[in-house]
Amino acid sequence: YRIGVTPTLGPYLLPQVLPEIHKRFQALRLFVREGVPAELSQDLRSAKHDLILSTQPIAESGLDVSPLFRESLKLVLPLDHRLASKDVINRMDLVGEEVLTLDEHHLYHRQVTELCQTLGANTRRDFEGTSLDTLRQMVVMGMGITFLPALYVASEIRETDPLRVADVFGVNMYRDHALAWRSRS
């Protein structure tokens, strides 16, 4: 099977689930390719993929979509940020903050931008990352704060990293993931 995944999900979820899938279905061959959600949906429709694992929304025309799970987003700050030492960070603390995000070609950019609008924060347009790793490194260098998916945080951020990872109280921060396939397959 040819599976398309988003680069902000696949590398952090698949290592947790593929070993069990291979254990249960030893003859199953999976070919994984990353892409942004719009490309993945198009590639699924044109039969370049058999399945896609993506963040919602997935353009559903001609596709069957099965919601899988909701993933929380975490606030990530450099240790010298004014909020890093607070025991509890609430939504009002983020009003006016400049938030780093991925470039606009990623669905994650839109999700973070919408979250920032809800919080009264602003996305930085002068520095945009091309990967979640880039965002993490930009925060380490003190270039700003960001929101990172919980699966990424669990996989890539260590206690020894010079970062504070926090929840923000008073706002639901999450993204939804789904599996999609062609309706006729």
PLM regions and their residue ranges:
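Short beta-strand->loop
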Residues: D64-K74, A150, E159-M173
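Flexible hinge/capping segments at coil-to-helix
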Residues: E60-V99
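Short, well-ordered beta-strand segments
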Residues: R2-G4, I52, V76, L100, ...
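Secondary-structure junction motif
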Residues: E98-L119
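A late-sequence structural motif
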Residues: L9, L13, L163-S185
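Central regulatory/effector-binding core of bacterial HTH transcription factors
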Residues: Y1-S61, G129
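Alpha-to-beta junction loops
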Residues: L28, L44-S54, L73, A121, ...
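Hydrophobic residues within well-ordered alpha-helices
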Residues: I3, D43-R45, L94, Q137-M143, ...
